[in-house]
Design a protein with these regions (language model features):
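Short beta->alpha connector loops
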Residues: 115-117, 138-143
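Bacterial carbohydrate/catabolite-sensing allosteric modules
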Residues: 1-9, 22, 54, 96-105, ...
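N-terminal helix-turn-helix DNA-binding module of bacterial transcription factors
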Residues: 1-72
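Amphipathic helical "hinge" segments at domain boundaries
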Residues: 57-122, 219
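Periplasmic-binding protein-like
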Residues: 132-138, 196-198
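Short, well-structured alpha-helical segments in soluble
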Residues: 119-131, 240-245
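Short acidic/polar active-site loop segments enriched in Thr and Asp
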Residues: 26, 72, 133, 193-194
């Protein structure tokens, strides 16, 4: 390794100018080589990339976003108006998302909002400020305003959950309706006949699916539904415990 390269590596950040000086090329040539422009020969592109790796060059995210129009960041806006609603799954969920994003050299931009109006305003702000190229939408609603907004702005998104009409949507979900049906049948197999059902908020699509599964399980077991044992609105463990009592 030459002296100039070692000196640069001792600095906090390697720049395009440092690379250009080390390679004896212009900054424009180095920049175009790093971005894969075809007017730069394959051998030069490879040479520049190898030197960038050796010197530890990393492009500034903000400058890269301005140049390419992409931030290489996913957006996630969490609701804070229901205390504790995210708690049962949030840590594992964030760990999975950030790990997958990092493997593709992407980052995760996380924001919070209280209520639908603030949620939509936050999504628009992250888009306008180029802080996210697309969004993950957890806890899908039966009539999800986030989807309508992002579709109108032609911004991609992935649903964590389902909607009534999933055509054209990328989504992933657990089969909550099947899990609920199996839960009912498991209780029946242990001799239980008076089975209660504590559901989440009915504004969320998963709650409707879970109720479908519960009703199907009761029907499969030949049991009648008891309206006084079917309650909804529990979005936290504490709320569920209170309704159970």
């Amino acid at each position: 390794m030459d002296t100039d390269t070692r000196a640069v590596e001792r600095r906090s950040r390697v720049t395009i100018s440092d690379l250009a000086d080390a390679l004896g090329l212009t900054k424009g040539t180095v920049s175009r080589a790093l971005n894969g422009y075809s007017d730069i020969s394959a051998s030069t592109r490879q040479r520049v990339r190898r030197k960038a790796e050796v010197m530890g060059y990393r492009p500034l995210a903000q400058a890269q976003a301005i140049r390419t129009g992409r931030s290489r960041a996913l957006g996630l806006v969490l609701q804070t108006d229901i205390p504790g609603a995210q708690r049962p799954f949030l840590s594992d969920f964030l760990a999975g998302v950030t790990t997958a994003a990092s493997e593709e050299s992407w980052t995760l931009t996380v924001a919070t909002s209280a209520g639908e109006a603030e949620m939509l305003a936050t999504l628009e702000r992250l888009i306008d400020e180029r802080k996210a190229d697309g969004f993950i939408l957890p806890r899908t609603g039966t009539h999800d305003a986030r989807m309508r907004l992002l579709r109108s702005l032609n911004v991609p998104f992935v649903l964590y959950g389902r909607v009534a009409d999933p055509d054209g949507c990328a989504w992933y979900d657990i089969l909550g309706e099947e899990a609920m049906r199996e839960a009912v049948l498991r209780l029946v197999s242990h001799g239980h006949r008076r089975i209660g059902f504590i559901n989440g908020g009915m504004e969320y699509n998963f709650s409707g699916l879970r109720e479908e599964g519960f009703r199907q399980g009761m029907a499969d077991a030949g049991l009648d539904l008891q309206a006084d044992l079917m309650l909804s609105g529990a979005m936290t463990r504490e709320a569920g415990s209170a309704l159970t009592r």
